[in-house]
Each structure stands twice: as structure tokens, then as C-alpha cells.
A protein has these predicted regions:
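Alpha-helical scaffolding within the catalytic cores
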Residues: 47-49, 84
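Short, well-ordered coil/turn elements that cap or connect secondary structure elements
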Residues: 31, 56, 121-123
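Catalytic cores of nucleic-acid endonucleases
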Residues: 65-121
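Non-catalytic C-terminal interaction segments of nucleic acid-processing enzymes
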Residues: 12, 84-87, 106-148
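Residue-level detector of flexible, active-site-proximal loop/helix-junction positions
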Residues: 42-43, 68, 133-135
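Acidic-basic catalytic patches of nuclease active cores, encompassing PD-(D/E)XK
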Residues: 1-43
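Active-site beta-strand-loop-beta-strand hairpin of nuclease catalytic cores
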Residues: 51-64
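Regulatory, intrinsically disordered low-complexity regions in eukaryotic nuclear proteins
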Residues: 37-38, 99-100, 127-129
């Protein structure tokens, strides 16, 4: 199944000027050297889904988890849902080459255990927004395990 990328009604869709989501996309676009904007996509049956960031060539797909404030365990579910969405979108947009999950520093907590490893194994890049710039997630340290 292939999705069709549609023109958005406005350049930034639901991301208001000054919103954390807009700042996140601008910072990631600066890092990658390509503008990223939210876009609606149409499925063959006419239903729609939005990707929170995509470049003009439709090669880079981005989902954002930009929550601020106190950490809530439910944020881990949002991370996993967005990873699942990115996998599907990468397979459904014929030109897609990269799938990036961009998270705020707060959300890094949700990437503990197997979640970050699964993202890496599935080819999903994780980047972290620190409030002004974006950098790839540093590999999580692994405890030394001595095997007999």
C-alpha cells in the first residue's frame, strides 16, 4: 500500500508559531540541512494520516514527542506508538529513506530498557531536542555482564 503526500492547508498545520513542535522541526531541519514540515497523507481508501515532519523530497519522515514538565509513564506509550507509525509510514511512502523520532530531553526517560534498542534494530533514528538544538541520542550504556 502506498500513501500519497498531500499539500497541507497551511505550512505549519496545527503547530503554532513558537510552539515546541515547530522549534523542534526547525532545529532538526537545520541539522539535516533540509526544511521539515507537517503534511497530511492519503491512504488508498481516502482516509488521512498526518506525518509531523517530512522534507520536500519525501525522504525523511519525522514524528515528535515534545512533552515538557513532569515525566509521566504514559509518555513511553506515545514513544512506542510513534515508532510503530514511523515503521508503517516508511514502508508506505515509496520515497522514504529515513525515519526519525525526535524527542525532548524529558522523554529520553521513556527510551530506557529495550525501547531504544528496538528503535535502533528497526532503523528508526532517535534525536533529542534540548530546547534549542538537536543531537542524535547517545547510545545508552550497558551494564557489564559476566558470563560463566
Amino acid at each position: 500500500m502506498h500513501l500519497t503526500v498531500l499539500d497541507a492547508p497551511t505550512e505549519w498545520s496545527r503547530f503554532a508559531e513558537g510552539s515546541v513542535e515547530r522549534r523542534m522541526l526547525l532545529a532538526l531541519g537545520d541539522l539535516l540541512g533540509t526544511p521539515l514540515r507537517p503534511k497530511p497523507l492519503m491512504l488508498p481508501d481516502g482516509s488521512r494520516v498526518e506525518v509531523e515532519g517530512i522534507d520536500r523530497a519525501c525522504r525523511v519522515l519525522v514524528q515528535l514527542v515534545g512533552n515538557q514538565g513532569a515525566y509521566k509513564p504514559a509518555y513511553r506509550n506515545k514513544v512506542m506508538a510513534d515508532m510503530f507509525k514511523l515503521l508503517w509510514l516508511r514502508e508506505s511512502v515509496p520515497t522514504a529513506e529515513r525515519a526519525i523520532l525526535l524527542v525532548s530531553e524529558l522523554i529520553v526517560q521513556a527510551l530506557g530498557g529495550w525501547v531504544a534498542r528496538a528503535a535502533t534494530d528497526l532503523g528508526i533514528e532517535i534525536h533529542v531536542y534540548d530546547g534549542s538544538t538537536v543531537a542524535p541520542l547517545r547510545p545508552l550504556s550497558r551494564p557489564d555482564v559476566k558470563r560463566p
